[in-house]
Amino acid sequence: MTKSNIAEVVSEWAEKALQLPFTIYCDLIPTADADGACVRHDPSPAAEKRFLDGSRYVSRNLTFYVRMKNAEQARELSQQITDKLDGATVTSPDGLEIDCEAVTLSQYIDTDSKGLTTYAAAIKCDYYEPAETN
């Protein structure tokens, strides 16, 4: 069952839907001097609501970072990811429906010493997680 891999499920969906020119990695961009993107979990509660049957309603915040040599393209791709996920429902391989909503628009973060510019946007992901059956 999908639990801790919500970031992977949502980022893979966005990557395929937009046919991005790079892979969206989890937690970091592996190459320090190349274009890329990553998604990170923002600090958030493990569950918004827990129910007596063991199920729960979960809300997680994800931030997508896009880093590129071309600052304009970095902003554009960050905005495309945001627009694609805003209002989307992503279905995980095990059938979990994840409702996505943009929390922020694409925001400039930094231009590093190598000339790579980073933009980021936050996406809220809500889903109902049924109780586990043993």
Regions found by a protein language model. Give the residues of each.
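Small/polar-rich, solvent-exposed N-terminal microdomains that initiate assembly or binding
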Residues: 1-52, 88-93
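Acidic/histidine-rich, surface-exposed loop or edge segments in extracytoplasmic proteins
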Residues: 60
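Helix-adjacent hinge/juxtasegments
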Residues: 55-57, 66-69
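Short, charged interaction patches at domain edges and termini
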Residues: 1-12, 44-57, 96-134
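Mid-chain, well-packed structural core segment of small domains
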Residues: 67-90
